[in-house]
């Protein structure tokens, strides 16, 4: 298993990425009795359906994080997807892939980090998302207010690579956030 993430909305729920054979996500509820496994509830998912009805079945899940809006961010061998706070994970395998507008006048967009291996995800105090990839460094994403029918949009604040920063490699294995300064 990978890193265990305690759900901030309900600390009895633990999110556990499975990294080996039959990769997926396990959601474990210990019902307040962590030493008694007999009353635990376990939910396992290895496939999700995105907002366009496409099947998402990553070969590997490398990272998981929860932002301050309670959205779950999942980094995989094929990119990333989110599980919005409104999704009941116990009964649904719904997810969303983030679409970044091309801003070229076509009205089209591309999936954020589509087919890019995402090794690390961290959320800072300002609810910015730091995403570490296997080949293209670190992306810093932030929320902006939107005039669309959604409350916010996501934009790239910065993209750090070996060419424009002091990163020793574009293969990012982990990201740590200094809590007091972000």
Predicted regions and their residues:
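Short coil-to-beta transitions that initiate beta-strands within beta-rich domains
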Residues: 1-11, 47-68, 101-126, 159-180
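Short loop/turn segments immediately following beta-strands, especially the blade-tip
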Residues: 28-38, 83-95, 141-152, 163
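Short, conserved, GDST-rich strand-edge loop motifs in beta-rich repeat architectures
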Residues: 2, 11-25, 79, 87-90
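Generic recognition of stable, solvent-exposed alpha-helical segments in well-folded globular domains
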Residues: 18-20, 75, 113-116, 133
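Beta-sheet-dominated scaffold domains
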Residues: 17, 87-117, 155
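Loop/turn residues immediately N-terminal
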Residues: 20-26, 77-81, 134-139, 181-182
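Conserved beta-propeller blade signature
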Residues: 13-17, 71-74, 81, 128-132, ...
């Amino acid at each position: 298993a990978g890193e265990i993430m305690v759900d901030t909305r309900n600390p009895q729920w633990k999110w556990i990425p499975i990294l080996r054979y039959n990769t997926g996500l396990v959601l474990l509820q210990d019902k307040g009795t962590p030493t008694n496994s007999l009353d635990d509830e376990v939910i396992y998912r290895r496939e999700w359906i995105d907002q366009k009805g496409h099947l998402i079945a990553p070969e590997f899940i490398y990272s998981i994080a929860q932002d301050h809006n309670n959205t779950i961010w999942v980094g995989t061998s094929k990119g990333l997807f989110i599980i919005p706070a409104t999704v009941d994970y116990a009964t649904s395998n719904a997810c969303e892939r983030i679409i970044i507008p091309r801003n070229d006048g076509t009205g089209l967009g591309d999936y954020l980090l589509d087919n890019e291996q995402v090794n690390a995800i961290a959320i800072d105090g300002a609810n910015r998302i730091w995403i570490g990839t296997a080949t293209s460094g670190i992306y810093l994403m932030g929320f902006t207010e939107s005039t669309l029918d959604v409350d916010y949009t996501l934009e790239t604040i910065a993209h750090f690579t070996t060419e424009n920063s002091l990163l020793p490699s574009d293969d990012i294995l982990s990201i740590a956030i200094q809590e007091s300064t972000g």
